[in-house]
Amino acid sequence: MTLKRNGNDAPLRIVRLDKELPLPRRAHPTDAGIDLYTAQDVTIAPGCRELVGTGIAIALPVGTVGLVHPRSGLALKKGLSIVNAPGTIDADYRGEIKVCLINLDPEEPIELARGERIAQLLVQEVSLCDVEEVNSVEELGVTVRGESGYGSTGV
């Protein structure tokens, strides 16, 4: 199958810091997320969080950002999520990718085995715009929404 790609076609360069772990990959060719694996066995007590290494370092293409999202199956079946979902990986970061996991189950600990899929990485284009200060809200421009914020479109 030939996939049509949009925008930046530069590859995601990955180094496995732990060669025994699988290379991160998509479960299906058209999946947005690339599965990330835990580099160690870990037990997360109810309501607790744990910073878990994935055993990889990456070089994202310039003009992209890596967003680390929870896996929906683990969220549903075990109550596992990511504290700062989505986690943000900047294109110039070269350290090990780590995921701050949290056990949202109020009673049961979550046991994760080394090599288990724990999160998914999405690579998205990002606008690297400059910051320009203006002197008043009026200089930001008028919109239909204006200052209507939280709950303004209904519950």
Curated annotation (Swiss-Prot):
Q: Which UniProt keywords apply?
A: Hydrolase, Magnesium, Metal-binding, Nucleotide metabolism
> Entry's SUPFAM superfamilies?
dUTPase-like
Give the reaction(s) catalysed.
Answer: dUTP + H2O = dUMP + diphosphate + H(+)
User: Biological process GO annotation list?
Assistant: dUMP biosynthetic process; dUTP catabolic process
Cofactor(s) it depends on: Mg(2+)
Q: What does this protein do?
A: This enzyme is involved in nucleotide metabolism: it produces dUMP, the immediate precursor of thymidine nucleotides and it decreases the intracellular concentration of dUTP so that uracil cannot be incorporated into DNA.
Which protein is depicted? Deoxyuridine 5'-triphosphate nucleotidohydrolase
